[in-house]
UniProtKB/Swiss-Prot annotation:
Source species of the chain: Methanococcus maripaludis (strain C5 / ATCC BAA-1333)
Pathway the protein contributes to: Metabolic intermediate biosynthesis; chorismate biosynthesis; chorismate from D-erythrose 4-phosphate and phosphoenolpyruvate: step 3/7
Species classification: Archaea, Methanobacteriati, Methanobacteriota, Methanomada group, Methanococci
Family, similarity comment: Belongs to the type-I 3-dehydroquinase family.
Catalytic activity: 3-dehydroquinate = 3-dehydroshikimate + H2O
One function term, GO molecular function aspect: 3-dehydroquinate dehydratase activity
Protein name: 3-dehydroquinate dehydratase
UniProt KW keywords: Amino-acid biosynthesis, Aromatic amino acid biosynthesis, Lyase, Schiff base
Assembly notes: Homodimer.
Gene: aroD
E.C. code: 4.2.1.10
Length: 218
């Protein structure tokens, strides 16, 4: 799957961007933390669209400045409305609460548990520990780390292969671009690509360029 982030600040713009993005990608990621205001009704609308609902905490590199309680309630609302995926951080103390809630109401939502390091790619043993912890909590493990070298890129690709079909792994930055291009072949459930001029992370590839490259590889 190709996932395209939606990073608009206005709700109506976000919906329009999502519709346009789905002409090129398979799903979108709604970065709810970037919206000026968000309501439960907005989450209901987002949940109708094939998407990942992400409300990234400020302490994990996001823009959510309101209370964590509101954040968790909005994510629960997405789960209640059977959003395709919700993303919750490994460091979030209430991640298990979301999983329990999902199971109790028998929602079809898959829960992605994520970890980010915007400066480096940790050693492989540390990354394995992260992924194992994530898989004990949610359905899909995700990590996005900054790749500073080819060695970092190989490390990330190796882990994708180890956890084939259970992981989303990304190498941010120029050195990590190969992880975005080869990720699907190495076992990542999805790869992120952006609409022109709307990258949500360093090194994100334009979706049209990515599709051209993937067609050449095939």
């Amino acid at each position: 799957m190709i996932c395209i982030p939606v990073i608009d600040e206005d709700m109506s713009d976000a919906i329009n961007s999502a519709k346009e993005a789905l002409k090129y990608g398979d799903i979108v990621e709604f970065r709810v933390d970037l919206l000026n205001n968000v309501t439960f009704e907005d989450i209901t609308e987002f949940s109708k669209i094939p998407s990942i609902i992400t409300i990234r905490a400020e302490w994990e590199g996001g823009a959510w400045k309101k209370s964590n309680e509101e954040r968790i309630e909005l994510l629960k609302h997405a789960i209640k409305n059977n959003a395709k995926f919700v993303d919750i951080e490994l460091k979030e103390e209430k991640n298990l609460e979301l999983v329990k809630y999902r199971n109790e109401i028998r929602s079809n939502t898959k829960i992605i548990v994520s970890y980010h390091d915007f400066e480096k790619t940790p050693e492989i043993d540390e990354l394995i520990d992260v992924v194992e912890k994530e898989l004990k909590i949610g359905d899909i493990a995700k990590f996005a780390t900054f790749a500073n070298s080819k060695e970092d890129t190989l490390k990330i690709l190796n882990l994708m292969n180890k956890y084939y079909g259970k992981i989303i792994a990304i190498g941010m930055g120029e050195s990590g671009k190969l992880t975005r291009i080869l990720g699907l072949d190495f076992g990542s459930i999805l790869t992120f690509a952006s609409m022109e001029g709307k990258a949500s992370a360093p090194g994100q590839v334009d979706v049209k360029k990515l599709k051209e490259i993937l067609e050449l590889i095939e």
